[in-house]
């Protein structure tokens, strides 16, 4: 009321001169009325872009130039209101209906509007375009509301939190051409009446919770140009054959929505279709030859299904094809030669099938290929010379085949090349000149082949611009020295040259590679000295020089590497004493000095006391370990040194005690000050009026109801990120309330957290715990989630919940949790890295369906807590942490993949990540590898003994996926999208 009175006086003060002169024109009155409506709208906003400061009553004469406002030239009525991307939060005032009937365009997309869509919106009878996408609107869309909006042409409600059934009144809108209801929580079936749209060209219902069959009636909308029905809907049945009647269709997307059955041959009637997405379903049968009639097709993706048979030759009619994806199916036969003759083909991905024969000899000759992935098949023969004919090739992946012969020399001049993975083949010949030094190459894998010759020296000097981060040439027959030009690979992080025939002195130039994380030069013929320049590789964490002929001593400069945790120099010819300085490397947890000619005594300092006896065996002149103790005089001198150190330590302790005592008195005084401040803030915190509640869907409770849950007797869990309480709202809804660790007061991170929570609140996926609301004041942040009655996977597997998970339930949990992570990694923009994937963060619903929880919060714990706490928050939990974190202190989505692999091993074995595995210091990953020898058939040795009648093929496949996920090198791990694909295909017969 006060706001309205204030607005009235503003209007009065601005027009009082006009009143006095009796000169108010109808035009001015209209402008004032419309300005008043916009001011009412602005007052309902909680926050907005500063550009909306132009909206003020004294400025009413320039109403039509206000931000986002457009008018007609005749009577200055507002016809368009565009408030998109203005950082607006809050609600929409009912006053908006007063802009009818002149308003024809309303766009409020990409903001943070919340609450229900006001019914007054439906009163905008002249509206032609309504775009409310990418907000946080909730509740149901009125069944009859849209029937008033008879002029509507475009309705875009994508990416909100609407729920309930799809609104039926939309079918009465005869002018409607564009309808997007995707990215919401609509449930139930698609109404058959949706087939009665008269003018519809664009229909998207993807990304909801729709069930049932796709109605055949949709085929009656023959005006359709684009149709999107996939992504996380869960349909029964298959693709309606009647869709072959949608002759105007250009884009058909039915991906990832549980479709079964065969691909209808009738789809071949869609002559205008340019994009067909059917990937990630459960489609069976063969690829219909009739698809070759879709002569306009540019994109065909049938990947991650259960398709069988051969690639039909009739697909040669797809002369406009640019993307051809058939990967992760059960296809066999040869790759037809016509594939290499498709003139516009850019992306070809046929990996993980059973293709045999040769790669088409002319592949790449069209000059347009950008990406080729034919890995994990049974291909033989030579690699075609023409792959990079057009100098556009960026990705070449052919690993795990039976290819032989030389590498095409032309690949050494393929400058766009970014990823090059040809390991696990039978390739011979030398490395093409220039290949290692290509300017854009990031990953080079040629391990496990029969390559010969020397590693080429860079002649042109272009390597200084190299992007190469990983080289794997291990297990070949390469010979000669490492070229000095390796110093120019400044971005190199991983250098794997083990199991070759390389010789000569290891070049000191390697010390200039400051980004190196791992070096493996074991099992070669290197001689000469250990280069002291290695000590300049300050990021190095792994160094293996074993099984060579290196002599001299280990340079003390190595001790400068503060994060080195693995050092292996065994089976060489080192012949001097072990440097004491190595003992001061607290990071060094594993070292092997065995089978050399080291002399003297083993240092007793620092880390040397932790190394096993086997680390020193085979050194006849070395004493000081259990198998070869030193003589008495040596022991006596060591004892005297120890006494001197103890005396020095006592003096240091005395000085430190005085310092700490003084600091303690100061701290005691500060405690009283802090307690007084805390007491004052607690009094303020208990006032619900200071709390702000942001809902991400329709809420049946208020902030005071949430605060009632935050009591000690409601605690159901405590962790590194806060305390979790269970609560029951007035409407009977059960919720979980997470109280986050206290954020630094006045920190600039507060706004960052609030903004991130807004992003997390918009995430919608059936396998992700739904964030219902965010409740906060200046001191405390509370997250309100849907409650999961069966607790966490960790509690069920390892706790005392009294629940035993059958194998089929475990496999289903694995698949559903993978889908949740896949959504975070691949379908969120920007992608979200979980940062703490573990079994305790996978919650189980009433039917034991998996929901990923606690995602996206760790980086705020990093920002707002001390360094000691942030380490665990960022990296994850003990037993789940990817090995590269130890030396990079950075994580990415592949870190999540590693952690998920650990969860899979928990599901298979029923054991904790860190358990009693019979040997100190090993975890579930190491134990599983030891027990099975990394062989999938060995899964029977580690399977949970409580399980019976397990499908052997399923267990083997799930273990295979787990082993891929926990690969030591992150680049070798699959993406979560690939993990979903592999687990989806794991279900097989044959039990044991």
From Swiss-Prot:
| Recorded phenotype for the gene knockout or disruption | When associated with BAM1 and BAM2 disruptions, loss of stem cells at the shoot and flower meristems. The disruption of BAM3 restores root protophloem and mersitem phenotypes observed in brx mutants. The bam3 mutant resists to root growth inhibition mediated by CLE45 peptide ligand.
- Binding-site list for ATP: 716-724, 738
Q: Where is the signal peptide?
A: 1-21
Conditions for induction: Accumulates upon CLE45 peptide application. Accumulation is promoted by CRN, especially at later stages of protophloem development.
Q: Which residues form the active site?
A: 836 (proton acceptor)
* Domain Protein kinase residues, every copy: 710-992
Which residues are glycosylated according to the annotation? 28, 75, 87, 131, 163, 220, 256, 293, 354, 440, 472, 525, 568, 575, 597, 613, 631, 635
An example of a GO molecular function for this protein is: identical protein binding
Result, substituting residue 364 to R? Insensitivity to root growth inhibition mediated by CLE45 peptide
SMART domains registered for this protein in UniProt:
LRR_TYP (SM00369), S_TKc (SM00220)
Q: Which GO terms describe its cellular component?
A: endoplasmic reticulum membrane; plasma membrane
Q: List the disulfide bonds.
A: 64-71
Location in or out of the cell:
Cell membrane; Endoplasmic reticulum membrane
Keyword annotations from UniProtKB, A to Z: ATP-binding, Cell membrane, Developmental protein, Differentiation, Disulfide bond, Endoplasmic reticulum, Glycoprotein, Kinase, Leucine-rich repeat, Membrane, Nucleotide-binding, Receptor, Repeat, Serine/threonine-protein kinase, Signal, Transferase, Transmembrane, Transmembrane helix
> EC number(s) for this protein?
2.7.11.1
Q: What happens when you mutate residue 883 to S?
A: Insensitivity to root growth inhibition mediated by CLE45 peptide
Name the protein family. Answer: Belongs to the protein kinase superfamily. Ser/Thr protein kinase family.
Q: What does this protein do?
A: Necessary for male gametophyte development, as well as ovule specification and function. Required for the development of high-ordered vascular strands within the leaf and a correlated control of leaf shape, size and symmetry. LRR-rich receptor-like kinase (LRR-RLK) involved in the perception of CLE45 peptide ligand which mediates root growth inhibition by repressing protophloem differentiation; this mechanism requires CRN.
Please give the name of this protein.
Answer: Leucine-rich repeat receptor-like serine/threonine-protein kinase BAM3
Q: Whose protein is this, by species?
A: Arabidopsis thaliana (Mouse-ear cress)
Corresponding gene? Answer: BAM3
């Amino acid at each position: 009321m006060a706001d309205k009175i204030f607005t009235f006086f503003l209007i009065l003060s601005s027009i009082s001169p006009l009143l006095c002169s009796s000169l108010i024109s109808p035009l001015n009155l209209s402008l004032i009325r419309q300005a008043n409506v916009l001011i009412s709208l602005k007052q309902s906003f909680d926050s907005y872009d500063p550009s909306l400061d132009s909206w003020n009553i004294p400025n009413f004469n320039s109403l039509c130039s206000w931000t986002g406002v457009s008018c007609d030239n005749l009577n200055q009525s507002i016809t368009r209101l565009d408030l998109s991307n203005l950082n607006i939060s809050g609600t929409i005032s009912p006053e908006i209906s007063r802009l009818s009937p002149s308003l024809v365009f309303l766009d409020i997309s990409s903001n943070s509007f919340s609450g229900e869509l006001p019914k007054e919106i439906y009163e905008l009878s002249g509206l032609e375009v309504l775009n409310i996408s990418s907000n946080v609107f909730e509740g149901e869309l009125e069944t009859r509301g849209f029937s008033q909006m008879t002029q509507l042409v475009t309705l875009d409600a994508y990416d909100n939190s609407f729920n309930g059934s799809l609104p039926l009144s939309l079918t009465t809108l005869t002018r409607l051409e564009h309808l997007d209801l995707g990215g919401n929580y609509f449930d139930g079936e698609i109404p058959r009446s949706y087939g009665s749209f008269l003018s519809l060209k664009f229909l998207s219902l993807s990304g909801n919770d729709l069930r049932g069959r796709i109605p055949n009636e949709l085929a009656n909308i023959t005006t359709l140009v684009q149709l999107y029905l996939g992504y996380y809907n869960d349909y029964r049945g298959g693709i309606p054959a009647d869709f072959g009647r949608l002759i105007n269709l250009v884009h058909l997307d039915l991906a990832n929505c549980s479709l079964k059955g065969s691909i209808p041959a009738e789809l071949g009637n869609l002559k205008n279709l340019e994009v067909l997405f059917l990937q990630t379903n459960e489609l069976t049968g063969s690829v219909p030859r009739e698809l070759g009639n879709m002569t306009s097709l540019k994109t065909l993706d049938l990947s991650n299904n259960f398709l069988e048979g051969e690639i039909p030759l009739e697909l040669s009619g797809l002369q406009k094809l640019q993307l051809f994806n058939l990967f992760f199916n059960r296809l066999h036969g040869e790759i037809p030669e016509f594939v290499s003759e498709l003139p516009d083909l850019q992306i070809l991905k046929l990996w993980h099938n059973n293709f045999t024969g040769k790669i088409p000899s002319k592949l790449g000759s069209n000059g347009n290929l950008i990406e080729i992935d034919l890995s994990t098949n049974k291909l033989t023969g030579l690699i075609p010379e023409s792959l990079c004919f057009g100098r556009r090739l960026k990705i070449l992946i052919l690993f795990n085949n039976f290819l032989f012969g030389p590498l095409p020399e032309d690949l050494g001049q393929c400058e766009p090349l970014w990823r090059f993975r040809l390991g696990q083949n039978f390739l011979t010949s030398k490395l093409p000149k220039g290949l290692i030094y290509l300017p854009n190459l990031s990953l080079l894998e040629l391990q496990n082949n029969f390559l010969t010759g020397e590693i080429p020296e860079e002649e042109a000097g272009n390597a200084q611009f190299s992007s190469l981060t990983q080289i794997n040439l291990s297990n070949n027959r390469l010979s000669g020295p490492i070229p000095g030009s390796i110093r120019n690979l400044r971005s190199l992080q991983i250098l794997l040259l083990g199991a070759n025939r390389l010789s000569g002195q290891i070049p000191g130039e390697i010390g200039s590679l400051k980004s190196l994380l791992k070096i493996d030069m074991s099992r070669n013929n290197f001689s000469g000295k250990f280069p002291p320049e290695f000590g300049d590789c300050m990021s190095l964490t792994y160094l293996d020089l074993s099984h060579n002929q290196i002599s001299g001593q280990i340079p003390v400069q190595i001790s400068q590497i503060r994060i080195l945790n693995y050092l292996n120099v065994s089976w060489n010819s080192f012949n001097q004493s072990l440097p004491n300085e190595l003992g001061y490397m607290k990071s060094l947890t594993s070292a092997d000095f065995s089978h050399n000619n080291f002399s003297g005594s083993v240092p007793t300092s620092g880390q040397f006391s932790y190394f096993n006896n086997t680390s020193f065996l085979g050194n006849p002149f070395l004493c000081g370990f259990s198998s070869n103790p030193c003589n008495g005089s040596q022991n006596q001198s060591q004892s005297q040194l120890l006494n001197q150190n103890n005396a020095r330590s006592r003096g240091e302790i005395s000085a430190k005690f005085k310092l700490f005592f003084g600091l303690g008195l100061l701290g005691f005084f500060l405690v009283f000050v802090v307690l007084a401040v805390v007491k004052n803030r607690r009094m303020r915190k208990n006032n619900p009026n200071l709390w702000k509640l942001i809902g991400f869907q329709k809420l049946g409770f208020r902030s005071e109801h949430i605060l009632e849950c935050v009591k000690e007797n409601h605690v159901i869990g405590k962790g590194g990120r806060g305390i979790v309480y269970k609560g029951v709202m007035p409407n009977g809804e059960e919720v979980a309330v997470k109280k986050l660790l206290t954020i630094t007061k006045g920190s600039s991170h507060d706004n960052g957290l609030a903004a991130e929570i807004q992003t997390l609140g918009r995430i919608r996926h059936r396998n992700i715990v739904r964030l219902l609301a965010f409740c906060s004041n200046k001191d405390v942040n509370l997250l309100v989630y849907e409650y999961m009655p069966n607790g966490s996977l960790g509690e069920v597997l390892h706790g005392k919940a009294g629940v035993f998970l059958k194998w089929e339930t475990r496999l289903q949990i694995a698949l559903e949790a993978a889908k949740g992570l896949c959504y975070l990694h691949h379908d969120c923009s920007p992608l979200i890295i979980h940062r703490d994937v573990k079994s305790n963060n996978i919650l189980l619903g009433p039917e034991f369906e998996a929901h990923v929880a606690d995602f996206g919060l760790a980086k705020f714990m990093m920002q707002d807590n001390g360094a000691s706490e942030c380490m665990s928050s960022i990296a994850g939990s003990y037993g789940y942490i990817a090995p590269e974190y130890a030396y990079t202190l950075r994580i990415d989505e592949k870190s999540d993949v590693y952690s998920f692999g650990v969860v899979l091993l928990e599901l298979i074995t029923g054991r904790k990540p860190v358990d009693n595995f019979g040997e100190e210091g090993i975890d579930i990953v190491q134990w599983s590898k030891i027990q099975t020898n990394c062989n999938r058939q060995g899964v029977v040795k580690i399977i949970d003994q409580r399980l019976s009648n397990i499908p052997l093929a399923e267990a083997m496949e799930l273990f295979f996926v787990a082993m891929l996920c926990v690969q030591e090198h992150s680049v070798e791990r699959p993406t979560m999208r690939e993990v979903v694909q592999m687990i989806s295909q794991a279900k097989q017969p044959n039990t044991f």
